[in-house]
Swiss-Prot record:
Its EC number is 6.1.1.23. It comes from Campylobacter hominis (strain ATCC BAA-381 / DSM 21671 / CCUG 45161 / LMG 19568 / NCTC 13146 / CH001A). This is Aspartate--tRNA(Asp/Asn) ligase. Residues 197-200 are annotated as: Aspartate. Homodimer. ATP binds at R219, D220, E221, Q228, E477, G529, F530, D531, R532. The keyword Metal-binding does not apply.
C-alpha cells in the first residue's frame, strides 16, 4: 500500500514512482491546481493534483477536507526554485498525483490539529487527535528508542528481564494502594504494586543475580505535574554488590539512553552527601546548572545585638542562618522586585526576608544596624561582597529555612535567567537519613523499610543513616535506590524502630523474612522513573505529554471517562456495596 514514509523522500528521488499515505494537513486551490500537504508520522510532503495529469485525481482532491485519510500514487518532481520551502524536509520536491484514494473521510474536527491554544482538557478528551502531530509522535518515538537502549544496555551487562506480578498484596510503601476486589475470595483484595520492590528482592534470594524490568507501577496519591497514578520505571536489582556497583550500572543505562536520543553525557556523575545538599542548596535534589550556594553565617549572627537573631543562631541543632549572594543584584533588582521576593518566601513559612545591599557609600539594609563594624567586615569577607552585590538572609527553624531558601535560590536563578536549558547536570545524592519524623511525632522510613542502615544500633533514631542514593538531573529526581537489608535480624530491628510489632511483621512480611533467613545474598538496586526521564529528554512541561493516554490531576481519563461505575450484578459478584460519600 505504501512505498515510503513522506520524509524518506528527497531530491535524490526525483522521477521515482511512489505511493504515500497519510492525513490531509492542509489543502489549497491555486488556479485550478489543488495542493495538499499530506502528513504521516514522519512529517509532510506536498501532493499536486493537476487535471492535466489526472482529471480523476483532481476531482477527488476537490472533495477532501482536513484530516481525510488519503493514499496517493504518483511521481516525484522538483519544485520550482521560487516554490522551495526550506522549512520542510521535503521542501524541494512534490508528488504529482496520478491516482488518489480517500481511505476514510473525517468529520469536522473539535479543534485544529497542532493548535497550541487548545485547552489540555479538550486535548485529553480527544487524545487520539492530539497525538496526530509530528511533535507528539516524535516524543513517543524518542521514548521507544530510549526503552530499547535501556534493554540493550542491561542485556549487555548480563541482566535478566523478569516480569513480576501486577496483582499482589498490600504492603506499606508510603502511598495508598489501588485495591482490586477478588471475586473468588469474597471480602479479600489484591493491590496493584507501587513498585516490584519485594519481588525483585526475592529474585535475588533465588540466585537470579541480575534482574531488570520496565515495570508498571501504581500509586493512589495526590498528583502533581510530574506524577501519575500509573507510571513506568526502569527497575534494576543485583546481588553481591555495593553502592558504587549499582551507581555504575545506573550511569551506564542513562548514558546509553541519552546516546539513543542524540546526547552525550559524561560519567561518572558527581556525588554529594544528603547533608551537604540540604545545607548548601536547601534541597535533596539540587540543581547544579548555576551557583548561588548557601553561605552559613550563623556564627556571625550569634554576635548580633539583636537578641532574636542571636538566639536563633545559637541553637545550631534546631535552627539555621543562611545567606544567598547575588553578584550585581543591587544594580538589577528594583524596590518592587525586592518586595516580591519577600512575598514569595513568606508563602513557604518565612517570617520575612532580610538583606544587605553593597553601595559605593557602604552597606545598606535593615540588618546593618544590628552588627558592630568588625562583624560587618567579617560578613563582607565571608560572603566576598563587592559594590553592587546584594545578599539575602534566612533565619529560623532548620527545616523551614532550608526549604524556603532552597526555593528562593531557584526563583532567583529564573529571575536572572541563569539556568542554561541545554545543560545536563547529573548528581548522586547519598547517605540519606534512614528515618524521617512525621507531623504526629512518629517516624517512617525516608525511602522504604527494606533499605540497609549504616548504624542501626545508634540510640538517636534521627542519626541513623542509610545506604541509599538518588540520581538527580537538573534539580529533578530521576530515580532512587539502596543497598537492601539481607539479614533477618536487621530487618526485624528496622521494623521494631518503625513500631511494627512482631505479629504484624509476620502477617505482612513473613514471606520476606523467611527468604532472608534462607541464605539471602547482599543485594541492592535502583529504579529510574522513565516517564519523568522522558519528560526531561523531550523538554516537555509535564509527564502527561510523554504518556500516550494519561490521567488528569484528578486521576481521571477524559477519553474513556475512567474511573466509571459498575453494574449491580458485578457488585453482587464481588460482595460489595457502595456507600456514597457526602459531597463536601
Amino acid at each position: 500500500m505504501r512505498s515510503n514514509y513522506c520524509t524518506e523522500l528527497d531530491s535524490g528521488d526525483i522521477g521515482k514512482i511512489v505511493d504515500v499515505c497519510g492525513w490531509v494537513n492542509s489543502y489549497r486551490d491555486h488556479g485550478g491546481v489543488i495542493f495538499i500537504d499530506l502528513r504521516d508520522r514522519s512529517g509532510l510532503i506536498q501532493l499536486v493534483c493537476d487535471p492535466k495529469h489526472s482529471q480523476e485525481a483532481y476531482t477527488i482532491a476537490n472533495s477532501v477536507r482536513d484530516e481525510f485519510v488519503l493514499r496517493a500514487h504518483g511521481k516525484i518532481r522538483a519544485r520550482g526554485k521560487d516554490l522551495i520551502n526550506p522549512k520542510l524536509k521535503t521542501g524541494e520536491i512534490e508528488v504529482v498525483v496520478e491516482n488518489l484514494i480517500v481511505e476514510n473521510p473525517s468529520k469536522p474536527l473539535p479543534f485544529v490539529i497542532g493548535d497550541k491554544n487548545v485547552s489540555e482538557e479538550t486535548r485529553l478528551k480527544y487524545r487520539f487527535l492530539d497525538l496526530r502531530t509530528n511533535e507528539n509522535f516524535n516524543k513517543f518515538f524518542t521514548r521507544s528508542k530510549a526503552a530499547i537502549a535501556a534493554r540493550n544496555a542491561l542485556d549487555r551487562l548480563g541482566f535478566v528481564e523478569v516480569e513480576t506480578p501486577i496483582l499482589t498484596r498490600a504492603t506499606p510503601e508510603g502511598a495508598r494502594d489501588y485495591l482490586v476486589p477478588s471475586r473468588v475470595y469474597n471480602g479479600q483484595f489484591y493491590a496493584l504494586p507501587q513498585s516490584p520492590q519485594l519481588f525483585k528482592q526475592l529474585l535475588m534470594c533465588s540466585c537470579f543475580d541480575k534482574y531488570f524490568q520496565i515495570a508498571r507501577c501504581f500509586r493512589d496519591e495526590d498528583l502533581r505535574a510530574d506524577r501519575q497514578p500509573e507510571f513506568t520505571q526502569i527497575d534494576i536489582e543485583m546481588s553481591f554488590c555495593d553502592q558504587k556497583d549499582v551507581m555504575k550500572v545506573g550511569e551506564a543505562v542513562l548514558k546509553d539512553i541519552f546516546k539513543s536520543c542524540g546526547k552525550d553525557i559524561k560519567t561518572p556523575f558527581r556525588v554529594m552527601q544528603y547533608k551537604d545538599a540540604m545545607e548548601n542548596y536547601g534541597s535533596d535534589k539540587p540543581d547544579l546548572r548555576f551557583g548561588m550556594k548557601f553561605i552559613d553565617v550563623a556564627d556571625i549572627f550569634e554576635k548580633s545585638s539583636n537578641e532574636i537573631f542571636a538566639n536563633i543562631a545559637k541553637d545550631k541543632k534546631k535552627n539555621r542562618v543562611k545567606a544567598i549572594k547575588v553578584e550585581g543584584g543591587d544594580l538589577k533588582f528594583s524596590k518592587r522586585q525586592m518586595q516580591r521576593f519577600e512575598e514569595y518566601v513568606r508563602k513557604f513559612g518565612a517570617q520575612g526576608l532580610a538583606f544587605i545591599q553593597v553601595k559605593e557609600e557602604g552597606l545598606k539594609g535593615p540588618l546593618v544596624k544590628f552588627f558592630e563594624k568588625s562583624e560587618i567586615d567579617e560578613l563582607v569577607k565571608r560572603c566576598e561582597l563587592k559594590v553592587g552585590d546584594v545578599v539575602f538572609f534566612g533565619a529560623g527553624k532548620k527545616k523551614i529555612v532550608l526549604d524556603y531558601m532552597g526555593r528562593f535560590r531557584i526563583f532567583l536563578a529564573n529571575e536572572l535567567e541563569l539556568i542554561n536549558p541545554d545543560a545536563l547536570e547529573f548528581l548522586w545524592v547519598v547517605d540519606f537519613p534512614m528515618f524521617e519524623q512525621n507531623e504526629d511525632g512518629t517516624y517512617s522510613a525516608m525511602h522504604h523499610p527494606f533499605t540497609m542502615p549504616n548504624n542501626v544500633d545508634e540510640p538517636d533514631i534521627e542519626e541513623i543513616t542509610s545506604i541509599a542514593y538518588d540520581v538527580v538531573l537538573n534539580g529533578i529526581e530521576l530515580g532512587g535506590g539502596s543497598i537492601r537489608i539481607h539479614k533477618e535480624d536487621i530487618q526485624e530491628k528496622v521494623f521494631k524502630l518503625l513500631k511494627i510489632e512482631p505479629a504484624e511483621q509476620r502477617e505482612k512480611f513473613g514471606f520476606l523474612l523467611d527468604a532472608l533467613s534462607f541464605g539471602a545474598p547482599p543485594h541492592g538496586g535502583i529504579a529510574i522513573g522513565f516517564d519523568r526521564l522522558m519528560m526531561l529528554v523531550t523538554r516537555s512541561s509535564s509527564i502527561r505529554d510523554v504518556i500516550a493516554f494519561p490521567k488528569t490531576q484528578r486521576a481521571q481519563c477524559l477519553l474513556t471517562k475512567a474511573p466509571s461505575g459498575i453494574s449491580n450484578e458485578q457488585l453482587r459478584e464481588l460482595g460489595l456495596k457502595i456507600n456514597k460519600k457526602e459531597q463536601k
